[in-house]
C-alpha cells in the first residue's frame, strides 16, 4: 500500500468529484521506483470506477500520463508524485476528467489562445514547497490547450538526467529542450514569460483610486482589506501576491494557527482579499512614484495608475552576500531555499552562510540530507536562539566557523568551494564543497523610491505610529519600513495601521 489510511480517506472525497472517465497510461520497468509507481496507480484505479490503467511506452520509465478516453492530454508524471506533489496529482485527475480549474476566465482564455507547440519539463523534488505551483500551472495549461504538454520529473528518480543538465535548484523548467526558468512561478507569471501576459493598455481606463496599495504580502493584504471595508475605492499592485511568505515553509508563530506553510497562508490571504471589491493587479512591478494633484504610480509595463493616497508594502527579499561567484553560480550550487534545493545536494558537502535563526535552521535541515555542513558566521558568536544552537551542536556532521568573512564562491560549471578570511588571524582559508546556502537576512524592496520618501541607512522607509511617511498621503507598512521586527503578524498589524491612517487622511483632506 502506497497511501496511508488518512490520505486514502481524504482522497476518497476527491474521487467523488471526477466527472468523466480517465485513463492512466503507465510506462514501468523492474526497478523499485516502477514497482512503487504501479502500486500507486493501481490503488488510484481501485478507488474509482472512472479510472482505468493501460500499459504504454512513454519517453521516460518509470512514468505515467493522465488522459481522457481516446485523447492524450500531455500531462505526465515521471516518478511518484507524493509529498508536496500529491496535490498536483489529485488536481490533474480532476481537471483531466473535466472539472474546471479555479482560475479567472480571463486567464483560461489566454491559455486557450496560445498557438504553436510547447513541450514543458519541470524538474522538482517532493520536499519542495515552491514546486507544486509550477507543476499545477503547467498541468492546467496542458489540459486547456492541446498545443501544450508537460512532464513533471522527480529529480530523485532521475538523478543522472538532473546531473547531466547540471540542475542544482528546483523547480527548474525547460521548454522545448531549452532552459525556461527556475523558482516559483504562477500561471500568470508563466504566461507573461511566454509573452501572453497583461499589457499596459489594460490599465488605460482605470479611474483614480482612493487608496492604492503597492505590494501583496501580509501587510499589503491587510491594508487592502481594511480600506475596502471602509467602502473606499481600493487597488493592489503586486509583483507576486503573497510576497516572501510564499518562500517560507514552516510558520508556527502566527497566533491562533498552530502551524501552517507559507504558500497556504498566501493562498488564504488572496482568497480573503477577493472577498472584497478590490482591484488586484498581479505580476506588476512598480517603477516610479510621484505626487502631483494625485499620486501617480508608473509600472514597469509603462502603465500609470493614479490615487489619492498610497500605501507602500513592498516587503523585503533575501540579502545577497555580494562576493565573486554568488551571481555566477546562482542555481548552480548557490541557493537560498534549503527546503526546496536541499535534496539535490544529498550526500554532498555544503556551506550555510549566516548564524541567525534562518541560517541555523537551514543547517539543521540540511544535516539530515547532505554529507557535511559548514556554517560560516561573520560575528564572534552565533545569533540564533539557544534552542537551535543546542540542536546544531548535537549534530555530528556540522562544523561551525565564527569570525568568518566570506571572500569568494568558487567553481567551474558549478560550485566547487568557498573561500573565507579568518577575521581574528587574517588567514585565508578554502573549503571544498558543492553547495552554498545564503541565509543572512533581508533587504527592503525600496531602491525604486530613491529621492521620493525618507528612508534610513538600511533603505527602510521611516514611518510614524500611524504608518505615515515623510510625504503627506503616502503611508507604508511591513518589512519595507523601519519596524523594529520583521514578523508576519507584525506586518499584518502595520498594514491595518497604515490603512486606518490613510482613511483618516482622506477624511481630513
From Swiss-Prot:
Catalytic activity, as annotated: a ubiquinone + NADH + 5 H(+)(in) = a ubiquinol + NAD(+) + 4 H(+)(out)
Looking up InterPro entries in the UniProt record yields: AhpF_NTD_C, AhpF_NTD_N, Alkyl_hydroperoxide_Rdtase_suF, FAD/NAD-bd_sf, FAD/NAD-binding_dom, Ferredoxin-NADP_redctase_2, Pyr_nucl-diS_OxRdtase_2_AS, Thioredoxin-like_fold
Which Enzyme Commission numbers does its entry carry? 7.1.1.2
Q: Which cofactor does it need?
A: FAD
State the Pfam families in the record.
Pyr_redox_2, Thioredoxin_3
Name the coiled-coil region(s).
none
UniProt binding sites for FAD: 210-241, 469-479
A single Gene Ontology molecular function, please?
NAD binding
Q: Does the keyword Cytoplasm apply?
A: no
What does the record say about its membrane topology? Peripheral membrane protein
Please cite one Gene Ontology biological process associated with this protein.
cell redox homeostasis
Residues binding NAD(+) are 349-379
Q: Where is this region: Catalytic?
A: 184-509
Family classification: Belongs to the class-II pyridine nucleotide-disulfide oxidoreductase family.
Instruction: Provide the function of this protein.
Output: Transfer of electrons from NADH to the respiratory chain. The immediate electron acceptor for the enzyme is believed to be ubiquinone.
Designated name of the protein: NADH dehydrogenase
Amino acid at each position: 500500500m502506497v497511501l496511508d489510511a488518512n490520505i486514502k480517506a481524504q482522497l476518497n472525497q476527491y474521487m467523488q468529484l471526477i466527472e468523466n472517465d480517465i485513463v492512466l497510461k503507465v510506462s514501468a520497468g523492474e526497478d523499485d521506483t516502477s514497482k512503487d509507481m504501479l502500486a500507486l496507480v493501481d490503488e488510484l484505479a481501485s478507488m474509482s470506477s472512472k479510472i482505468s490503467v493501460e500499459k504504454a511506452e512513454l519517453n521516460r520509465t518509470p512514468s505515467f500520463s493522465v488522459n481522457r478516453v481516446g485523447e492524450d492530454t500531455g500531462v505526465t508524471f515521471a516518478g511518484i508524485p507524493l509529498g508536496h506533489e500529491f496535490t498536483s496529482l489529485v488536481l490533474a485527475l480532476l481537471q483531466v476528467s473535466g472539472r474546471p480549474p479555479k482560475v479567472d476566465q480571463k486567464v483560461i482564455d489566454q491559455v486557450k489562445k496560445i498557438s504553436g507547440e510547447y513541450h514543458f519539463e519541470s524538474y522538482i523534488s517532493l520536499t519542495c514547497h515552491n514546486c507544486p505551483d509550477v507543476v499545477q500551472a503547467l498541468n492546467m495549461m496542458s489540459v486547456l490547450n492541446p498545443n501544450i504538454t508537460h512532464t513533471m520529473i522527480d529529480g530523485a528518480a532521475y538523478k543522472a538526467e538532473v546531473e547531466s543538465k547540471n540542475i542544482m535548484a528546483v523547480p527548474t523548467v525547460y521548454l522545448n529542450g531549452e532552459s525556461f526558468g527556475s523558482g516559483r512561478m504562477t500561471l500568470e507569471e508563466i504566461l507573461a514569460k511566454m509573452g501572453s501576459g497583461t499589457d499596459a493598455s489594460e490599465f488605460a481606463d482605470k479611474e483614480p483610486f482612493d487608496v492604492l496599495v503597492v505590494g501583496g504580502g501580509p501587510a499589503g493584504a491587510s491594508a487592502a482589506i481594511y480600506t475596502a471595508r471602509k467602502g473606499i475605492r481600493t487597488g493592489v499592485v503586486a509583483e507576486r501576491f503573497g510576497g516572501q511568505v510564499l518562500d517560507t515553509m514552516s510558520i508556527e508563530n502566527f497566533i491562533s494557527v498552530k502551524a501552517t506553510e507559507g504558500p497556504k497562508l498566501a493562498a488564504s490571504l488572496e482568497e480573503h482579499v477577493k472577498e472584497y471589491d478590490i482591484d488586484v493587479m498581479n505580476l506588476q512591478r512598480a517603477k516610479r512614484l510621484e505626487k502631483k494633484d494625485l499620486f501617480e504610480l508608473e509600472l514597469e509595463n509603462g502603465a500609470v495608475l493614479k490615487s489619492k493616497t498610497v500605501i507602500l508594502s513592498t516587503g523585503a527579499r533575501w540579502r545577497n552576500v555580494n562576493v565573486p561567484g554568488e551571481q555566477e553560480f546562482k542555481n548552480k550550487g548557490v541557493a537560498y531555499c534549503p527546503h526546496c534545493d536541499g535534496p539535490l545536494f544529498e550526500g554532498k558537502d555544503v556551506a550555510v552562510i549566516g548564524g541567525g535563526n534562518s541560517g541555523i535552521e537551514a543547517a539543521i535541515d540540511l544535516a539530515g540530507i547532505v554529507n557535511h555542513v559548514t556554517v560560516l558566521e561573520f560575528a564572534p558568536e552565533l545569533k540564533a536562539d539557544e534552542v537551535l544552537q543546542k540542536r546544531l551542536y548535537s549534530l555530528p556532521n556540522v562544523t561551525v566557523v565564527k569570525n568568518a568573512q566570506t571572500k569568494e564562491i568558487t567553481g567551474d560549471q558549478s560550485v566547487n568551494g568557498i573561500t573565507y578570511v579568518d577575521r581574528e588571524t587574517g588567514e585565508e582559508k578554502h573549503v571544498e564543497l558543492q553547495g552554498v546556502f545564503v541565509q543572512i537576512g533581508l533587504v527592503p524592496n525600496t531602491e525604486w523610491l530613491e529621492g521620493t520618501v525618507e528612508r534610513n541607512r538600511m533603505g527602510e522607509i521611516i514611518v510614524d505610529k500611524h504608518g505615515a511617511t515623510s510625504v503627506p498621503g503616502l503611508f507604508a507598512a511591513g518589512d519595507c519600513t523601519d519596524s523594529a521586527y520583521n514578523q508576519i503578524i507584525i506586518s499584518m498589524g502595520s498594514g491595518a495601521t497604515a490603512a486606518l491612517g490613510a482613511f483618516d487622511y482622506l477624511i481630513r483632506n
